[in-house]
């Protein structure tokens, strides 16, 4: 009991762990616009920033599309319309235009690369404006799923990252996992080859928190062995196991996939809590003894007084 009290006091009765977990797992944008290769300067975010000529162009294009679909609208017109989109109504219209383009075989022959260009631009605008539901409308289109199935372009990979990051940022985990399962069935190599996709999927699996989620997370982690030490990728399945009451497994995950380079307060804290919950109090204290000198050295290097 004395050991248990020591561990729990050092862990602040799990409050420290919970706070650290929220900082890593909470809904937020995982990758910056720069990291996602989104050039924000190419898009208009607010209605007030539009020039009267741009407003007139948008209105005219909407009228053309309403009356005759794409008969009087070029691919460049669609792309320009998206760059000037500032709200969900604009995005819904843009989505309908892209769907009409994807359904026109003649336009595919005339503009063979436009499908990915339009998909990428539309997803970028949705990300900038924070409109995941409008993005889902397009990505769920059968024609877009067909593009995903057939394309090997790097542009598809980038669009996927942007889309999944948008879903993660807005807490739409079911939709993210639906896309993951589609990719696992149709394009599994994209998941195997992309650490970014795997990370976003694993964060969503953590939120799902089922035994199947744990199995899927471990499968993904095993496919990305070369990325050992990535804190978020290691911590997600460990937390799933911990929350499911599989404390010994949680500790094993941290030991097997973690490295000394990735070992930090969050990982060390979870190791101690998992061992304590599993009744291995002596091992938990060993982890604590190893961690405290390391933490003191870090504080000294930063010019802070040693921890008491």
PLM regions with names:
Residues 1-308:
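A basic, Ser/Thr-enriched alpha-helical scaffold prevalent
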């Amino acid at each position: 009991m004395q050991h248990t009290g020591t561990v729990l006091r050092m862990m602040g009765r799990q409050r420290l762990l919970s706070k650290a977990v929220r900082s890593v797992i909470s809904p937020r944008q995982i990758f910056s616009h720069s990291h996602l290769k989104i050039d924000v300067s190419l898009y208009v975010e607010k209605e007030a920033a539009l020039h009267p000529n741009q407003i007139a162009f948008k209105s005219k294009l909407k009228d053309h599309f309403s009356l005759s679909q794409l008969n009087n609208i070029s691919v460049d017109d669609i792309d320009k319309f998206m760059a000037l989109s500032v709200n969900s109504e604009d995005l819904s219209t843009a989505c309908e235009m892209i769907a009409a383009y994807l359904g026109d075989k003649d336009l595919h022959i005339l503009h063979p690369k436009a499908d990915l260009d339009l998909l990428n631009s539309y997803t970028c605008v949705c990300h900038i404006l924070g409109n995941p539901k409008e993005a889902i409308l397009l990505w769920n289109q059968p024609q877009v799923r067909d593009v995903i199935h057939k394309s090997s372009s790097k542009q598809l990979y980038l669009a996927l990252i942007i889309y999944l990051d948008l879903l993660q940022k807005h807490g739409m985990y079911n939709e993210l996992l639906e896309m993951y399962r589609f990719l696992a069935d149709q394009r599994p190599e994209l998941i195997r080859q992309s650490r970014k996709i795997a990370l976003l999927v694993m964060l969503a699996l953590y939120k799902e928190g089922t035994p199947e989620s744990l199995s899927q997370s471990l499968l993904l982690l095993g496919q990305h062995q070369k990325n050992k030490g990535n804190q978020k990728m290691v911590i997600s399945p460990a937390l799933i196991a911990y929350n499911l009451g599989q404390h010994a497994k949680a500790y094993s995950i941290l030991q097997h996939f973690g490295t000394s380079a990735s070992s930090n307060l969050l990982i060390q804290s979870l190791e101690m809590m998992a061992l304590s919950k599993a009744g291995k109090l002596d091992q938990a204290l060993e982890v604590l003894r190893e961690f405290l000198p390391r933490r003191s050295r870090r504080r000294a290097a930063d010019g802070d007084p040693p921890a008491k």
